[in-house]
């Protein structure tokens, strides 16, 4: 699928979206750094508040990333729905994969949960 701003990032393999070329060691290191920061923030704020902040930050960065691919706001606006669909599809795939991992490994992942 072409990124609405012009870059090709997502590729369709069967019925599964993936970004294989981006899922390298550095990818997971960056993700872990964001998770570590979120975990630190839960010392001062609720998990729900931290999650909302992370979602907002991700959405804001996605909007910025998208804007970089357009010449003006009108061109960006013309691709608004396509852009939303693109990012929602990616988030959905990642969320479903992580939910499935937690379902399969619930006891191992949550054995230290206090509440």
Predicted feature residues:
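Solvent-exposed interaction surfaces and binding hotspots enriched for charged
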Residues: 19-115
């Amino acid at each position: 699928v072409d990124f609405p701003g012009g870059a090709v990032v997502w590729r369709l393999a069967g019925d599964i979206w993936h970004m294989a070329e981006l899922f390298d060691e550095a990818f997971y290191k960056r993700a872990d750094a964001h998770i570590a920061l979120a975990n630190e923030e839960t010392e001062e704020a609720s998990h729900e508040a931290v999650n909302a902040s992370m979602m907002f930050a991700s959405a804001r960065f996605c909007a910025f990333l998208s804007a970089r691919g357009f010449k003006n706001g009108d061109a960006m606006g013309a691709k608004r729905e396509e852009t939303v669909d693109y990012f929602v599809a990616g988030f959905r795939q990642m969320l479903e994969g992580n939910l499935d991992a937690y379902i399969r490994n619930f006891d191992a992942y949550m054995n230290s949960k206090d509440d």
